[in-house]
Regions:
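A structural signal for short, well-ordered beta-strand segments and their strand-loop junctions
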Residues: 68-72, 116-121, 179-183, 223-225
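Short, well-formed alpha-helical segments that are part of the catalytic scaffolds
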Residues: 2-38
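A short acidic (Asp/Glu
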Residues: 14-16, 35-37, 79-82, 128-134, ...
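C-terminal catalytic/acceptor-binding lobe
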Residues: 1, 9-11, 160-238
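Conserved catalytic core of nucleotide-sugar-dependent glycosyltransferases
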Residues: 78-167
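Short acidic, S/G/P-rich loop/turn micro-motifs used as interaction or catalytic elements
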Residues: 9-12, 32, 75-78, 125-127
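Active-site-proximal specificity loops/subdomain of glycosyltransferases
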Residues: 27-71, 76-91
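Short beta->alpha connector loops
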Residues: 7-12, 50, 150-152
Length: 238
């Protein structure tokens, strides 16, 4: 198993390595020397590979691992929510071994279910927690924390500049009848508040075009898409 962290223009400002010090950062070859000052494991991605979607596919083709975990480089909160009688509390888990063991369990569950991917909830808000539904099989996943069985059956669609994780998720549900959504843990990232990475090219227009393409390809699986502040919120019909 490899924990793959695509990153760009964020040397010295990433946080994921603080939780997962043995993860592997995949960065443009021109930035390797910058990242090596802060990161234990750094792999150079050729400069001919441009954009997050081709980068993900390059990782899948070149990492020589069957089980690949994609994680963003800017983790903010990771752990679970403890629900008490009148309030809830965020419990942080920053123990690398805990996460490695959990990721291994998720891959094992996928094998038993005949699925090829799993994902952890990517927001820590209490309103997003459903204690009676710790695992969902008809839900969305994002590549902020996503595991993929790398046997060649599923690759990211490079016609999607963004929302490539939504597309592969919907394709998997269409093909396999479900997907493994882990909801009793969360892995939340900074995203828009951190310079570099996808923020360099993820514009409202780029997002809008990707969503239009998703709706065209999976019309019965998307019920609505609304813009909230800097992001689009996609409501799925699963």
């Amino acid at each position: 198993m490899i924990i793959a962290v695509p990153s760009k223009n964020r040397a010295g400002r990433t946080t994921t390595q603080k939780v997962l010090p043995n993860c592997t950062f995949f960065v443009p070859e021109s930035e390797v020397h910058q990242y090596e000052q802060f990161i234990k494991n750094v792999v150079a991605v050729p400069m001919t590979i441009r954009g997050i979607t081709p980068t993900r596919n390059w990782i899948l083709r070149n990492c020589n691992e069957k089980n690949v975990v994609f994680i963003d480089d800017d983790v903010k909160y990771c752990g679970y929510l403890r629900l008490d009688e009148r309030k809830c509390k965020k419990i942080e888990i920053r123990d690398e071994q805990f996460w490695i063991e959990e990721f291994a369990k998720f891959f094992s569950m996928c094998e038993e279910l005949k699925y090829k991917m799993w994902g952890v909830r990517t927001e820590s808000s209490p309103r997003a927690a459903y204690p009676y539904k710790p695992i969902l099989f008809r839900t969305y996943l994002t590549a902020s924390c996503m595991g993929l069985i790398n046997d060649g059956e599923y690759m990211f669609d490079e016609s999607y500049v963004v929302k490539e994780d939504y597309e592969i998720c919907l394709r998997h549900i269409r093909d396999k009848g479900g997907i493994l959504g882990i909801r009793y843990l969360h892995w939340e990232n900074e995203h828009w508040s951190t310079e570099g990475g996808c923020k360099d090219y993820r514009t409202i227009d780029v997002e809008r075009q990707a969503i239009k393409k998703l709706i065209k390809e999976y019309p019965s699986m998307i019920s609505s898409a609304k813009r909230t502040n800097n992001e689009f919120c996609i409501k799925l019909n699963l």
